């Protein structure tokens, strides 16, 4: 189901006073959200803690009322509808399973609260529960209690419970945060499989950049309640629109530079070829280079020369800090250099990304 957010804003009254003032401006948790969520896709809401992503999720499900704007599910305006009438399922980091009920009864619980024309017979409920349990691969655990399950199994129960009512959209608020790294990665793959098999629109809140890039069809990057960029994981990583996105998504070297003309930029006292155009002449810009795009070469062969200040083994690569005259670069390489060694740095034009200074993250 397609979801459309039209100029969605949520303000909260400020509490207390500051330096003797009795009144403070309202806190804007979500500011002018205006974008469309395609039908049957997994959308990641990504941003640091306190950026408004959970507030946005609560607006979509109806737990909060927007201060301004509208929410459409398909062609239906659901802005004023309560959560139970929106056809949404929710999964939280806290699984909230009933400890005294079996897995089967936990999954069945929301079906027992259906009323009127939606009420199901016992046979229909049992069928729905079994289908949901099979989908998340826990149909062999239906007679167990939550305390007899692992963390990953408990998470699957919570997902099955959210899916058993056949929601139009599933909202997930950092559901894997309590799991260890290996299990979290396994569940990322599992959630993507479930989404693709059901065709339900998933909206997934996370502050984990790798998680968002791994799972999402499209990523919405947020900061201070404002959408910074919407795009595919590849676009978000390779073509960040501002310094905040570049710095928040993965690691970045962000250097002050001057765009001399199309495809030519100056930074760190040297002139480099790049592929960007349309910035005008002699325009101050931010230059973004990913650590993995910098290559360490012999000192005399690099456009930049520097000294290796530190080296850390990260498992798949070494992370080195190379101090040049103008900037200390982070470099990722599969080959380690010794601390104190003078090296050269090279980068190809395609890996030099240019952005306007005025396009930095809004605060």
Q: Which residue stretches match the model-derived regions?
A:
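The feature captures the beta-strand-to-loop junction immediately N-terminal to the Walker
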Residues: 46-48
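Helix-to-loop junction immediately C-terminal to a conserved catalytic motif
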Residues: 61
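Conserved coupling/switch loops of ABC nucleotide-binding domains, chiefly the family-specific signature
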Residues: 67-70, 224, 256
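Conserved ABC transporter NBD signature motif
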Residues: 69-77
């Amino acid at each position: 189901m397609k979801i459309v957010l039209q100029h969605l804003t949520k303000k909260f009254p400020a509490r207390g006073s500051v330096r003797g003032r009795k009144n403070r401006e309202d806190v804007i948790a979500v500011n002018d959200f205006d974008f469309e969520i395609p039908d049957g896709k997994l959308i990641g809401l990504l941003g640091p803690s306190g950026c408004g992503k959970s507030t946005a999720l609560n607006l979509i499900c109806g737990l909060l009322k927007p201060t301004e704007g509208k929410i459409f599910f398909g062609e239906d305006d659901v802005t004023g509808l309560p959560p139970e009438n929106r056809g949404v399922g929710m999964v939280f980091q806290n699984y909230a399973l009933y400890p005294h009920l079996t897995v089967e009864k936990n999954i069945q619980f929301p079906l027992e609260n259906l009323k009127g024309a939606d009420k199901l017979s016992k046979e229909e409920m049992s069928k729905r529960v079994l289908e949901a349990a099979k989908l998340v691969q826990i149909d062999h655990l239906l007679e167990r209690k939550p305390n007899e399950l692992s963390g990953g199994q408990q998470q699957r129960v919570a997902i099955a419970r959210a899916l058993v009512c056949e929601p139009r959209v599933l909202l997930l608020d950092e559901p894997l945060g309590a799991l260890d790294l290996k299990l979290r990665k396994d569940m990322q793959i599992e959630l993507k499989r479930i989404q693709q098999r059901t065709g339900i629109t998933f909206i997934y809140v996370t502050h984990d950049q790798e998680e968002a890039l791994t799972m999402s069809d499209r990523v919405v990057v947020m900061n201070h309640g404002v959408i910074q960029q919407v795009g595919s994981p590849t676009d978000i990583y390779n073509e960040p629109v501002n310094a905040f996105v570049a710095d928040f998504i993965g690691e970045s070297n962000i250097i002050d530079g001057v765009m001399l003309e199309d495809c030519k930029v100056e930074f760190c006292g040297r002139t480099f070829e790049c592929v960007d155009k349309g910035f005008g002449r002699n325009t101050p810009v931010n230059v973004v280079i990913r650590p993995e795009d910098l290559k360490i070469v012999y000192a005399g062969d690099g456009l930049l020369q520097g000294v290796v200040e530190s080296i850390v083994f990260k498992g798949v690569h070494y992370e080195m800090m190379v101090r040049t005259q103008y900037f200390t670069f982070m470099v990722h390489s599969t080959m380690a250099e010794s601390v104190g060694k003078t090296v050269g740095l090279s980068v190809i034009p395609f890996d030099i990304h240019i952005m306007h200074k005025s396009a930095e993250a809004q605060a």
